[in-house]
Amino acid sequence: MPTAPDIAPLLLAWWDAGHADLPWRRTRDPYAVWVSEVMLQQTQIATVIPYYERWMARFPAVAALAGASLDDVLKLWEGLGYYSRARNLHAAAQQVMAEHDGRLPTTAAGLMDLRGIGRYTAGAIASIAFDEPAPVLDGNVIRVLSRLVDLPDDATQTATRNALWQLAANLVPVDRPGDYNQALMELGQSVCLPGNPLCLLCPLARVCLARQRGTQAERPVRPPRKRTPHYDVVAGVIWATGTPSADGRFLITQRPLDGMLGGLWEFPGGKQEAGESLEAALVREIREELAIDITPGAHLTTVDHAYTHFRITLHAFHASYDGGEPQHLGVADHAWVTLADVDAYAFAVTDRKIIATLRASLGGG
């Protein structure tokens, strides 16, 4: 079984020989490390870089983020996905200001008291910013460690995950824990790849048990993938005057803050039920969410989108507003807007595609 003296020198020498130059690696500021680690969760590095740079220019410190409105935060995050990350960053920044005099806790245990910070993020911040020998365990590290010890157990099971956390804790060195953890993550990102690991380039190849036994393609062990559910969803571009136009007003709604895509704006609608036409689904959903009457019109566009655990086909229709004062029965807020001012609001990617189609077909904005 590989031990810390076997692993750390090899990994740190590889790191020192040349690692990726990324914006967040040019500082040990705990706030900057925190922002980068949250953005990098389930998101590619190339995607994160421009978002990180814009974020740090707009919110350069905890106080700036804590003092911003949630709408401003979500707008800056727009397009990055997994919006609960942005909401949690905002709430945790306010928590830091209120409970910690504007300074992040300096230990992994203390960091985990903040909203949205779990064991991985806490370990990354504590090791990189504060030199605490705290372990990290994300998808990349799970893959590296599972191959390193040739782990035959299902990596999605709690007992296996706990064993991997213990292994990670045993291997992290007291000296340069932040560099070690970053090297471990970069190794998983660039060399110890999921489908075709580049073992000839790996600094740990000579101590990797899976490499020695030829089982690296079989590690980590995971259960067969389940079929991803698919749903048909409807959305209405509800025109105040009933007629689509480049300068006409249409209705948008804000999703409840505590749900999926919470706080984002969208064209109102919802999921089609069995045996229901798309138009009937739109009428029903609008009544349930807003208590207003509409008449569906022409089909506008169809958007396919995959989320983490399900897929949707979004069918967007023009619709006319027939009456009733909008009530917030299933929404947090509503607004009547035009194409000229709709960009002030934060939308998910599916609704941005509807807006793009509106502009292409009507002009304006």
Language-model features: where?
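Catalytic cores of DNA base-excision repair glycosylases
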Residues: 3, 9-213, 291
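Short aromatic/basic micro-patch
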Residues: 266, 311, 335-336
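The catalytic Nudix box helix
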Residues: 267-301
